[in-house]
Amino acid sequence: MIRIGQGFDVHQLTEGRPLLLGGVHIPHPKGLLGHSDADVLLHTITDAALGAIGAGDLGKHFPDTDEAFKDADSKHLLSQAWQLVKNAGYTLGNVDCTVMAQKPKLAPYIEAMRKQIAELLETDVANVSVKATTTETLGFVGREEGIAAQAVILLQKAE
């Protein structure tokens, strides 16, 4: 049996915070605002994984109203969600992600993101795709007010 999950997330850019995407620190004057470390890419993957097994979303498992998750490391949140996937009897087929950001240019960091995500999902890097795009200066992403990401995940029943 296979299961598919989809995730989407947006975070506002703000000064005074580090920019983390896919578990990788990206040098930039602004970072993402959020209750946790606001890693928008890992959040979308977490949502996609939880959705694929019918277990809700990031907010259900790690609510931003709970101080226990204040400044939480999104790598830890994804690892906890991934344990639920494994407990449900599934393994990763593949995950395909897109990050939408006007700046910074993300191409130099894509491979590091793929490696980090592969490690968190206990898979080969060949099963992880991360792409980056701009919105051609349109909308909040184009005005550099925020960064958005989406992910689609394919899970397979473990043998």
UniProtKB/Swiss-Prot annotation:
Entry superkingdom: Bacteria
Swiss-Prot/TrEMBL catalytic activity: 4-CDP-2-C-methyl-D-erythritol 2-phosphate = 2-C-methyl-D-erythritol 2,4-cyclic diphosphate + CMP
Name recorded for this polypeptide: 2-C-methyl-D-erythritol 2,4-cyclodiphosphate synthase
Assembly behavior: Homotrimer.
Keywords linked to the UniProt accession: Isoprene biosynthesis, Lyase, Metal-binding
Chain's gene name: ispF
Function in brief: Involved in the biosynthesis of isopentenyl diphosphate (IPP) and dimethylallyl diphosphate (DMAPP), two major building blocks of isoprenoid compounds. Catalyzes the conversion of 4-diphosphocytidyl-2-C-methyl-D-erythritol 2-phosphate (CDP-ME2P) to 2-C-methyl-D-erythritol 2,4-cyclodiphosphate (ME-CPP) with a corresponding release of cytidine 5-monophosphate (CMP).
UniProt keyword Metal-binding, yes or no: yes
A single BP term in Gene Ontology: terpenoid biosynthetic process
Cofactor, how bound (note): Binds 1 divalent metal cation per subunit.
Pathway annotation from the record: Isoprenoid biosynthesis; isopentenyl diphosphate biosynthesis via DXP pathway; isopentenyl diphosphate from 1-deoxy-D-xylulose 5-phosphate: step 4/6
Entry binding sites for 4-CDP-2-C-methyl-D-erythritol 2-phosphate: 9-11, 35-36, 57-59, 62-66, 133-136, 140, 143
